[in-house]
């Protein structure tokens, strides 16, 4: 959200955040790091912004929860169980820890993102946060750092946006047509397709129905696919 706001204003955005402890450093199995998402976005001339929005874990924690709710497995290499053994079972992964992406390099990035987002804001590191699900009303005290870089202070907004677009085209043209995507391409396509409707898994719909029933509210009406 904040990265999109920044790029819409013609600036380059860098956003980092911390979370609760769900990720183990490379070589470990105890969850002491957060998924520590990192977003970098840059406006592009005549195109959508070039934006990378990623968790520093091998897979986003939300995707692990979605796999559990759908009764599906997660990819190999995403997580280990409490015993440190690799697992593709999302429930075991939640009880254990997620892996960082990219081995020791991703692990280093995860640590540095946490240092930036927590240390500069006097927030807690993931391992020191309060579990708000077990302690409702408590403050988790995660940290967030939002940086906006104005290209006008460098080579100028127009020239920067043109350079960014050149990079997008170079990436897209590096393989067979339609087979290589620049950062942000899949998300832009998905946002366009979801502008009027959002597709939900049957298990998610069932959970929503149960919630609305419990609250005594009319169930949401599903649109035809």
Where are these regions (language model features)?
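Long, hydrophobic, well-ordered secondary-structure blocks that form the structural core
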Residues: 1-25, 30-32
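Short coil/turn connectors at secondary-structure junctions
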Residues: 8-12, 34-37, 45-49, 73-76, ...
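Glycine-rich phosphate/pyrophosphate-binding loops
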Residues: 11-22, 116-132
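Short beta-strand segments
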Residues: 14-17, 41-43, 52-55, 148, ...
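Phosphate/diphosphate-binding glycine-rich loops and adjacent basic-rich segments that engage nucleotide
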Residues: 21-91
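Small-residue-enriched flexible segments
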Residues: 61-122, 139
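Catalytic-core signal marking the mid-to-C-terminal active-site face
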Residues: 120, 125-225
């Amino acid at each position: 959200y904040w990265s999109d706001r920044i790029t819409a204003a013609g600036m380059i955005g860098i956003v980092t955040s911390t979370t609760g402890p769900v990720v183990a450093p490379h070589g470990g199995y105890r969850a002491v790091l957060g998924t520590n998402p990192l977003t970098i976005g840059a406006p592009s001339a005549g195109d959508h912004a070039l934006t990378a929005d990623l968790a520093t874990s091998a897979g986003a924690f939300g995707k692990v929860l979605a796999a559990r709710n759908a009764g599906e497995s997660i990819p190999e290499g995403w997580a280990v169980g409490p015993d440190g053994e690799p697992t593709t079972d999302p429930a075991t992964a939640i009880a254990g820890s997620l892996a960082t992406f990219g081995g020791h390099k991703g692990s280093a990035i995860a640590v540095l993102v946490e240092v930036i987002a927590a240390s500069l804001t006097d927030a807690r590191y993931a391992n020191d946060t309060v579990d708000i699900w077990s302690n409702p009303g408590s403050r988790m005290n995660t940290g967030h750092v939002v940086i906006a870089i104005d290209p006008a202070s460098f080579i100028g907004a127009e020239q920067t946006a043109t350079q960014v677009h050149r990079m997008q085209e170079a990436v897209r043209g590096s393989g067979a047509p339609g087979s290589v995507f620049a950062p942000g391409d899949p998300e832009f396509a998905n946002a366009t397709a979801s502008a009027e409707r959002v597709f939900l898994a049957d298990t998610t719909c069932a959970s929503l129905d149960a919630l609305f029933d419990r609250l005594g509210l009319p169930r949401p009406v599903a649109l035809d696919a």
